[in-house]
């Protein structure tokens, strides 16, 4: 079993990032790109501001935003999003995620 290489701080004097930070940042970029295809940008900005106010500019905040966006996308697509399967016509899910409100059939 080999040891993990020692991590050194950047030469330009910026602080060292936590392990996995590159993965978190790349994942956040990908999920934000997908979320923009399905949700109103104003809603996503409000969500980002809310999480930023709670966590600041930290990896924990980025992880929290990833968790929330994953859940929102899952529920949205499960409920029958038109864009969830390209090339297929929309059909009702056998078990919709949320019941239809009264008077909106």
Curated annotation (Swiss-Prot):
Bilayer-spanning residue ranges: none
Is Phosphoprotein one of the keywords UniProt gives this record?
A: yes
List residues modified as Phosphoserine.
84
Q: What is this protein called?
A: Protein Vpr
* Chief location bin: virion
Q: Which residues lie within the region annotated Disordered?
A: 84-105
In its miscellaneous comment, the UniProt entry states: This isolate is from a Gambian case of 'neuro-AIDS'.
How this chain assembles, per its entry, is:
Interacts with human UNG.
InterPro entries under this entry? RetroV_VpR/X
Superkingdom, according to UniProt? Viruses
Secretion signal, residue range per the UniProt entry: none
Q: Where in or outside the cell is it found? A: Virion; Host nucleus
Q: What the protein does?
A: Stimulates gene expression driven by the HIV-2 LTR. Prevents infected cells from undergoing mitosis and proliferating, by inducing arrest or delay in the G2 phase of the cell cycle. Cell cycle arrest creates a favorable environment for maximizing viral expression and production.
GO biological process terms, semicolon-separated: symbiont entry into host cell; symbiont-mediated arrest of host cell cycle during G2/M transition; viral penetration into host nucleus
Record GO cellular component, one term: host cell nucleus
This protein's UniProt keywords: Activator, AIDS, Cell cycle, Host G2/M cell cycle arrest by virus, Host nucleus, Host-virus interaction, Modulation of host cell cycle by virus, Phosphoprotein, Transcription, Transcription regulation, Viral penetration into host nucleus, Virion, Virus entry into host cell
